[in-house]
């Protein structure tokens, strides 16, 4: 039985990446050591981390005046690290189009009780269960604000921002965990981008931060571990980094570049692959996708429901038994969610659609 992993993260990794990692696991390039055990100060790992950065720069067209940092703590740590480094004494706006955006705003509010800055909720679609990307009047944004924070892909609710909003000249900070490398963005449109690896980059445990040099903090922070400037100047080696995770991420970057053909080709594949499922759901009177506007649909996370919660539960159970794993929707919204990240095979979407048709015929 073929197993398809629809997990929202950690998620499917490219098979060629896993095979290469397997082949090199015990003896990395005749070093006599595994990457799991080699020093982060060794020449071998120095090449790994530098090659990882170089390939990511090429894939995303990252300009020279941006730093790339490999950190730990997941995107959730960035909810605190961003305002701690960038917002002191200023306003910071939050566009909340999903649960993770709300968590970022909530952490900022919590931090503002200790550090002097003003987090402001710019707009939210929470009242409609985040079924769309909220709009706002850019003239309401103070042009002297530190940043506008947004989430480019809402993993739980299945919405994305593809065209960046007008922010009245205020720099944009983007949480890009779940659609980085799956859609093309102009890095120069952002002051800072952060992304947890466990969806489109690699295994959980490493977080990529891309930050414009003039946006690096001037003042020392409460902790060196939470200080962008210190981390950047140390080349991601202020302390021992998650070496194996960075190595796997490098292999994924190589896969996107050499086997897929780059981000633009990857984005094309994602649009076509997700479109297969969206088209079927639209053609069905049994399944529903909750996203209000088609233009906001995610190419990575596709939530859907049947006519009842009982049928949803039955669908999940039968799907799991047939090898469609981790398709249950997030506990906050229920239903189902097909996370079809970059490494998820197109055939898995086709097989899921076949099962959905069969389930519909048997239960409508």
Curated annotation (Swiss-Prot):
Reaction equation(s) it catalyzes: O-phospho-L-serine + 2-oxoglutarate = 3-phosphooxypyruvate + L-glutamate; 4-(phosphooxy)-L-threonine + 2-oxoglutarate = (R)-3-hydroxy-2-oxo-4-phosphooxybutanoate + L-glutamate
Subcellular location: Cytoplasm
Top EC class for this record: transferase
GO MF annotation terms: O-phospho-L-serine:2-oxoglutarate aminotransferase activity; pyridoxal phosphate binding
Binding site for L-glutamate: 41
Cofactor, free-text remark: Binds 1 pyridoxal phosphate per subunit.
Name of the molecule in the record: Phosphoserine aminotransferase
GO cellular component: cytoplasm
Binding site for pyridoxal 5'-phosphate: 75-76, 100, 155, 198, 239-240
Cofactor(s) the protein requires to work: pyridoxal 5'-phosphate
Function according to Swiss-Prot or TrEMBL: Catalyzes the reversible conversion of 3-phosphohydroxypyruvate to phosphoserine and of 3-hydroxy-2-oxo-4-phosphonooxybutanoate to phosphohydroxythreonine.
HAMAP family reported in the protein's UniProt record: SerC_aminotrans_5 (MF_00160)
Keyword Flavoprotein appears in the UniProt entry: no
Highest taxon, organism lineage: Bacteria
Example GO BP: L-serine biosynthetic process
Family, similarity comment: Belongs to the class-V pyridoxal-phosphate-dependent aminotransferase family. SerC subfamily.
PTM sites of type N6-(pyridoxal phosphate)lysine: 199
A Pfam family annotated for this UniProt entry: Aminotran_5
Pathway where this protein functions: Amino-acid biosynthesis; L-serine biosynthesis; L-serine from 3-phospho-D-glycerate: step 2/3
Description of how the protein assembles with itself and partners: Homodimer.
EC numbers: 2.6.1.52
Location (main, coarse): cytoplasm
Keywords: Amino-acid biosynthesis, Aminotransferase, Cytoplasm, Pyridoxal phosphate, Pyridoxine biosynthesis, Serine biosynthesis, Transferase
